Amino acid sequence: MKTRNRFFAAALGLLLLGAASSGWAQPKVWMTPAEIMAALKPGQWVQMEGTIQKDLTVMCTQLKIMTGDFLDDDWSLVGVVRKVDQEKQQMEIMRIPVKVHKDTEYENEAGTFKGFSQVKVGSFVEVEGTYLKDGTFLAKEVEDESQKLAEDSGLENTIEAEGKVEKVDVAKSTFTVMGMTIKITNQTKSRSVIR
């Protein structure tokens, strides 16, 4: 889906930039935690990956601070479905309620994922859409990626998100996206990306 496509396009761009500029001083790629926290601002678009902790905070493993033009429906979330309410047409990823509507599109690699009735607790999905002010994610597209979970059980405790930074706490080295508290550590790999 577009989140992963952007990720690979950005990585390819950085590789090409490095190849094209051989002989020139190479730009610094990874940012320190202090540089990350200084760069993060409320309203800044980011793409992050991390590991969910027992207290439901997220230890950030990778972060891209993004600049460019974004639309209200450019948000995305990838993770394990924790709850499903077929009647309300709603699922929960981490603690984020994800609602679908009649125009939501469904897909998977095999082409067999056709509707919300196939979403189950434990499914590994990517949703794209709009994160609303009330804390609900309105999905325009749901992709079932459960085959990846079968191949790598470590994904069960991971989360990926693309969206706007809501709050930054420099003292705690944390920020929030979609209500998730995300912790920056010395192991966090981060860079700025132009979209």
PLM features per residue range, with description:
Residues 2-195:
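Short, flexible, surface-exposed loop segments at domain boundaries
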